[in-house]
Amino acid sequence: MREIVHLQAGQCGNQIGAKFWEVISDEHGIDPTGTYHGDSDLQLERINVYYNEATGGNYVPRAVLVDLEPGTMDSVRSGPFGQIFRPDNFVFGQSGAGNNWAKGHYTEGAELVDAVLDVVRKEAESCDCLQGFQLTHSLGGGTGSGMGTLLISKIREEFPDRIMNTFSVVPSPKVSDTVVEPYNATLSVHQLVENTDETYCIDNEALYDICFRTLKLTTPTYGDLNHLVSATMSGVTTCLRFPGQLNADLRKLAVNMVPFPRLHFFMPGFAPLTSRGSQQYRALTVPELTQQMFDAKNMMAACDPRHGRYLTVAAVFRGRMSMKEVDEQMLSVQSKNSSYFVEWIPNNVKTAVCDIPPRGLKMAATFIGNSTAIQELFKRISEQFTAMFRRKAFLHWYTGEGMDEMEFTEAESNMNDLVSEYQQYQDATAEEGEFEEEAEEEVA
């Protein structure tokens, strides 16, 4: 079986990671003790991807929980599914990273990283054929961003041919914990561009807007934001967890979604959007699902896809529905909005259907888009970064941990390069190459 090892780092990473395990354990019929109480063979057919089967038929998540302070991990352990994890897989320090990327990446995190790699190695060894890793973390703090990216590069060294997939929560001033978030995020993106194969950009700005505008929550809490994250994560991993043909493993997803190695930052979307604890009274139709799924308001990254073009798209429909109708709707979206899909990648939209819907919904759809509009998100962080960096504000926290200003400048220019690359492919047309060749022939 093709297994995935899950890592969660830092406060945010552990909170959304814990929610992820609650949601998928529920979908696979696994209770908090790890016992199976499901009602469908589909739930067990690919259970090995995320779970180890222990003695006595108990299922244990292939999860490694990491933090530089014990607080969040204690609350995960005492949470609803806290007892399902392997106790040895909790790896934590005592000092904390204090929202400082340098502490997570170079000092405190570097001391803990070998202990984490030992656990990762152990999990990888119990796999029959490991396909890759997924990490949940935020880019705004110290541990998830600094130590998370350190873990990625260390795992990359040791498992160079395995896929590295991250769920990265991008900071926003609307839901801000600290003033140095733009620094931490820029330094992290600098690492993610080079070291991951696929990154789902989960943008706090977008999550906040969805809660506020669509779900009409006047003061969204982290619980509300995490509810959206867990729905999205459950959706984008559906193809990996349930039997199916399309994007059935991380590598096939990467092949379909990533046309150029650096451009692997995806914009996830979800439909229908529901608030925590609410029930859906009316099942949506396939056309409604498709329309909502492509709607800018349903995107988990605060970028408007109408400001860019899609390089590639993967859609996952869940629930009992007519495949024919799904195909018709997806084709209709593409033909009506053809200008928003680059024409030099034919068949760049792929659709999968899974019979098992998420809990509480009859039908749902998840969207994964590789759109050039994601540059808006990087521009936003870059502007905030520059505003502080030109004054060298708060830099002493980083240089005090042994970092050099040079590294900030490099990270900044790498992110700006990424923005220009997206822009370049947004403007590219299919004919460009042909004209150049003709011109050369005439000159000759």
From Swiss-Prot:
It holds the Pfam family Tubulin_C. Some glutamate residues at the C-terminus are polyglutamylated, resulting in polyglutamate chains on the gamma-carboxyl group. Polyglutamylation plays a key role in microtubule severing by spastin (SPAST). SPAST preferentially recognizes and acts on microtubules decorated with short polyglutamate tails: severing activity by SPAST increases as the number of glutamates per tubulin rises from one to eight, but decreases beyond this glutamylation threshold. Glutamylation is also involved in cilia motility. Some glutamate residues at the C-terminus are monoglycylated but not polyglycylated due to the absence of functional TTLL10 in human. Monoglycylation is mainly limited to tubulin incorporated into cilia and flagella axonemes, which is required for their stability and maintenance. Flagella glycylation controls sperm motility. Both polyglutamylation and monoglycylation can coexist on the same protein on adjacent residues, and lowering glycylation levels increases polyglutamylation, and reciprocally. It is linked to Dystonia 4, torsion, autosomal dominant: A form of torsion dystonia, a disease defined by the presence of sustained involuntary muscle contractions, often leading to abnormal postures. 'Torsion' refers to the twisting nature of body movements, often affecting the trunk. DYT4 is characterized by onset in the second to third decade of progressive laryngeal dysphonia followed by the involvement of other muscles, such as the neck or limbs. Some patients develop an ataxic gait. Leukodystrophy, hypomyelinating, 6: A neurologic disorder characterized by onset in infancy or early childhood of delayed motor development and gait instability, followed by extrapyramidal movement disorders, such as dystonia, choreoathetosis, rigidity, opisthotonus, and oculogyric crises, progressive spastic tetraplegia, ataxia, and, more rarely, seizures. Most patients have cognitive decline and speech delay, but some can function normally. Brain MRI shows a combination of hypomyelination, cerebellar atrophy, and atrophy or disappearance of the putamen. InterPro entries: Beta-tubulin_BS, Beta_tubulin, Tub_FtsZ_C, Tubulin, Tubulin/FtsZ-like_C, Tubulin/FtsZ_2-layer-sand-dom, Tubulin/FtsZ_GTPase_sf, Tubulin_C. It is found in: Cytoplasm, Cytoskeleton. GO terms for biological process: microtubule cytoskeleton organization; mitotic cell cycle; negative regulation of microtubule polymerization. The lineage of its organism: Eukaryota, Metazoa, Chordata, Craniata, Vertebrata. Major isotype in brain, where it represents 46% of all beta-tubulins. In the brain, highest expression levels in the cerebellum, followed by putamen and white matter. Moderate levels in testis. Very low levels, if any, in other tissues. Mg(2+) binds at E69. The modification 5-glutamyl polyglutamate is found at E436. Belongs to the tubulin family. Transmembrane segments: none annotated. This is Tubulin beta-4A chain. The highly acidic C-terminal region may bind cations such as calcium.
